[in-house]
Amino acid sequence: MRLILLGPPGAGKGTQAQRLVEKHGIPQLSTGDMLRAAVQAGSEVGKRAKAVMDAGELVSDAIVNAIVAERIDQADCAKGFILDGYPRTLVQADAVESMLSERGIGLDTVIELVVDDRALVGRIVKRAEDAKAAGQPVRKDDNPAVFEERLREYYKKTAPLTGYYYAKGKLKTVDGLASIDAVTNEIEAVLTAAAEAR
């Protein structure tokens, strides 16, 4: 099973990805984790990424795409994987299609967690309040002003992916405002339908 989780920040992608990892035994591939692992491993592409990050610059699509390609070739991805936080742009989406096609595989489905913006801001404020109450540090991006900027960036760059995957017949939407268990159940229903359609 190879899938992409889409949705704005705070939609619950990380929570749902973790549940999918536990149930299906496939890895969650997040770009941040992959970049750190490539740098730590000292691979050729990891060295290029480190040089860019050390210079305080953003890692290019070419480097991110190479790191993703390197990662999906690892043995634990043979049964599938969950892409979380990648692709973020149409250029990256095209790169995913190419790298999978080169390997003779494809995406099973793309799941978008749909959540109302006002509810997202409320969710982030509550997450910050809960962290404070528990004596835990509050995430930098759990500040409403910072979060709203992240939302704007998401709609500008990443939201066009929904149309891209809809046109390919891969996009399925799930109500991200439902309870965590209800969202999980809906995702599992989507995955079952995708498996039966293969």
Curated annotation (Swiss-Prot):
Identification of the protein by name: Adenylate kinase
Family: Belongs to the adenylate kinase family.
PROSITE patterns hit by this protein: ADENYLATE_KINASE
Ranges where the record places region LID: 126-142
Enzymatic class: transferase
Localization of this protein: Cytoplasm
Chain sites annotated for binding ATP: 10-15, 127, 178
Domain notes: Consists of three domains, a large central CORE domain and two small peripheral domains, NMPbind and LID, which undergo movements during catalysis. The LID domain closes over the site of phosphoryl transfer upon ATP binding. Assembling and dissambling the active center during each catalytic cycle provides an effective means to prevent ATP hydrolysis.
Role, per record: Catalyzes the reversible transfer of the terminal phosphate group between ATP and AMP. Plays an important role in cellular energy homeostasis and in adenine nucleotide metabolism.
Keyword Kinase: yes
This protein's record includes keyword Protease: no
GO function terms (MF aspect): adenylate kinase activity; ATP binding
Highest taxon of the lineage: Bacteria
Entries under HAMAP family matching the protein: Adenylate_kinase_Adk
A biological-process GO annotation: AMP salvage
Pathway recorded for this protein: Purine metabolism; AMP biosynthesis via salvage pathway; AMP from ADP: step 1/1
GO cellular component, as recorded: cytoplasm
Ranges for region NMP: 30-59
Keywords: ATP-binding, Cytoplasm, Kinase, Nucleotide biosynthesis, Nucleotide-binding, Transferase
Known partners and oligomeric status: Monomer.
Matching CDD domains: ADK
